[in-house]
């Protein structure tokens, strides 16, 4: 069997949810935290993660997903708790029927959604979250539009409860607080006087802004998986260890060949890297076909038998090469770790790629990389 796999520590995810919940409750004793499991739980397996959280956490307030397909996967997997569709619905009749049948909560962010929603003959009222665009300029109603649609929905029989929700564009940049503070001010002034729950922000708010921004519901996304939302270049960055979250994914594979090359020999496609000395190379069963980034630079570290070794040469579809010259006794079958340890995190790997992030790296792993769970 090919050695590439993603080892998922479910206990770490449960620990991280509990960290988020405790931080929330310290600021708001009646507060709630939505566990975000969109994009297959950021590549960690949505159904397995949701089931484990429900079994091993004392109180799970609900789950957030992107689409109706993701929500149905949870329901069909036996998850009967609150599920919020973070992008609302995309088509009218088909999705609204499923929302009704499966009792999903939805975000509403456009006039078209409002018009479709109020016309549909629901069998029971639906919990909705009306989204305010407080300055991200993505989804949501502007402050000048918001009250029109709030009033329209608050008097509609299809609505059981209206929450108010927004999202922040710069919350992961602690050295640049002005934009987040401005968005928070707009959100408060626009909706805080209205009845019903408020939700503002995700992992960056939970870990970095609760002294300023605290609402009734927060959304724990990337932090659930042990990854800090804060950009490593920030002077005030918070590492996973400093905020007491544990990495949940360890990406591993194996050495499939060990060979020697002479100084001056090109390595890999295009000969991007040329051996600077007589070298011992390891060929590893991991490539961009598995989701490992093709754009990774030479020198990006991996762990071979617990020792750091640099990637040299271009990443191929199925393989990559590492310099084993300083590591003795490496043989085919030996383990290679790409990320998921205190010594080597997914954020470390992102630094060696152009214009990517830990979010992208963990969600881009392909089905060629099976998930192996530790319970």
From Swiss-Prot:
Its cofactor is pyridoxal 5'-phosphate. Pathway: Amino-acid biosynthesis; D-alanine biosynthesis; D-alanine from L-alanine: step 1/1. It comes from the Eukaryota. The modification N6-(pyridoxal phosphate)lysine is found at residue 38. InterPro entries: Ala_racemase, Ala_racemase/Decarboxylase_C, Ala_racemase_C, Ala_racemase_N, Ala_racemase_pyridoxalP-BS, PLP-binding_barrel. GO terms for cellular component: cytosol; nucleus. Keywords: Isomerase, Pyridoxal phosphate. GO terms for molecular function: alanine racemase activity; pyridoxal phosphate binding; serine racemase activity. Optimum pH is 9.0-9.5. PROSITE patterns: ALANINE_RACEMASE. Its EC number is 5.1.1.1. The keyword Isomerase applies. One of its GO terms (biological process) is D-alanine catabolic process. Disulfide bonds: none annotated. HAMAP family: Ala_racemase (MF_01201). Belongs to the alanine racemase family. NCBIfam families: alr. This is Alanine racemase, catabolic. It comes from Schizosaccharomyces pombe (strain 972 / ATCC 24843) (Fission yeast).
């Amino acid at each position: 069997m090919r050695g590439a796999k993603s080892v998922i520590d479910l206990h770490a995810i449960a620990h991280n949810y509990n960290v988020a919940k405790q931080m929330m409750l310290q600021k708001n004793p009646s507060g709630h935290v939505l566990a975000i499991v969109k994009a297959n739980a950021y590549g960690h397996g949505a159904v397995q993660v949701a089931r484990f959280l429900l079994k091993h956490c004392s109180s799970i307030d609900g789950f957030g997903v992107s689409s109706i397909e993701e929500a149905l996967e949870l329901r069909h997997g036996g998850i009967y708790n609150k599920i919020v569709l973070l992008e609302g619905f995309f088509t009218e009749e088909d999705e609204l029927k499923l929302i009704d049948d499966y009792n999903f909560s939805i975000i509403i962010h456009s006039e078209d959604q409002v018009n479709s929603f109020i016309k549909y003959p629901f069998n029971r009222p639906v919990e909705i979250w009306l989204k305010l665009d407080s300055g991200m300029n993505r989804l949501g109603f502007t402050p000048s539009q918001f009250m029109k649609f709030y009033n329209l929905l608050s008097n509609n029989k299809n609505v059981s409860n209206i929450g108010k929700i927004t999202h922040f564009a710069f919350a992961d940049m602690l050295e640049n607080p002005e934009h987040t503070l401005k968005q928070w001010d707009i959100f408060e002034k626009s909706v805080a006087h209205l009845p019903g729950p408020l939700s503002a922000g995700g992992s960056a708010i939970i870990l970095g802004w609760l002294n300023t921004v605290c609402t009734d519901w927060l959304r724990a996304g990337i932090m659930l998986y042990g990854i800090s939302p804060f950009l490593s270049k920030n002077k005030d960055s918070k590492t996973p260890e400093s905020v007491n979250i544990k990495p949940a994914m360890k990406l591993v594979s194996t050495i499939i060949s060990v060979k020697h090359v002479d100084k001056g020999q090109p390595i890999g496609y295009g000969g991007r890297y040329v051996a600077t000395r007589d070298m011992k190379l390891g060929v590893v069963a991991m490539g961009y076909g598995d989701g490992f980034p093709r754009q990774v630079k030479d020198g990006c570290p991996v762990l071979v038998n617990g020792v750091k070794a640099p990637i040299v040469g271009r990443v191929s579809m199925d393989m990559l090469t590492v310099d084993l010259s300083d590591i003795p006794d490496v043989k085919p079958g030996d383990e290679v770790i790409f990320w998921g340890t205190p010594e080597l995190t997914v954020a470390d790997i992102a630094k060696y790629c152009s214009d990517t992030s830990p979010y992208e790296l963990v969600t881009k792993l392909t089905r060629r990389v099976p998930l192996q769970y530790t319970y």
